[in-house]
């Protein structure tokens, strides 16, 4: 018989569900920096609904949405949870996982208790007419990101997810390898391959912001696999060398530049200095490539500090594709460079 609570790193027999679990939890009363806001707590293990699965988490990834959740900005995650009928007094962080199925809802037929799975981060209502019509679930009105828009994230001993989120784990991968790319990897893939005709092609130059981070490191590898040429933007030579090991053809150390952020007014004396900085950054891309070719795709996620520069260096007919705003949400586009 399962114990009431297992120590972190200890697992009950397959199929035996304890009453309580350890979890990394955020509460509205302590929104702030992650080191203070995210704390280990003991909570009741959630019960799966008819279309759900309860998964013992073997490994979980880390994403910037953990930071956003901890701060309660730009979204108060506990308020968002109310929309889905979930608890509103706490939030468990985490949107990547690999693990073992421990319990199933009454309507689930394609999974088995004991099955090893990876968990993707997309959730939606099972009866959403948009999804049932075969359209992109990510654009459905009921779409939400598990572990950010929802309560029961992955940094816990157990998580409850919609059954369709569970995919078979490849046997040759470790738990950690299987868990790492389920949110960042799918996001990076969609950014690079999801917007035809603006998809990475052999020979394409792709500028990857934050090349050594979770999104960027996967983007660099996906560009390489597609035959493209990734130029990583990093904050140190060490990170640049790491990106080269992943398959980047070159890198640019952004700490060499100081023109970041929203540019001064176009007709102000300060704008000339900003433009000189952006031109120097573009020249650094050419130096990294060894040729005067601008990026056909700019892989963006910092947002406010970098979008103006991305717009400046992107090639004619190219694409800036963005999934976040880690440096801020307000930005500016100079239409002369569109």
Segments from the language model and where they lie:
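Adenosine-nucleotide cofactor-binding segment
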Residues: 225-305
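Rossmann-fold NAD(P)-binding glycine/threonine-rich loop
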Residues: 326-338
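Glycine-centered, small-residue-biased loops immediately flanking beta-strands
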Residues: 318
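NAD(P)H dinucleotide-binding glycine-rich loop of Rossmann-like/cofactor-binding domains
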Residues: 83-86, 95, 123-210, 257-268
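Helix-to-beta-strand junctions that scaffold the AdoMet/dcAdoMet cofactor pocket
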Residues: 201, 314-315
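NAD(P)H cofactor-binding loop motif with strongest signal on the N-terminal glycine-rich segment
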Residues: 210-211, 302
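Glycine-rich beta-strand-centered segment in the early N-terminal region that forms part
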Residues: 44-61, 74-133
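Hydrophobic/small residue at the entry helix of a nucleotide-binding pocket
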Residues: 187, 214-215, 305-306
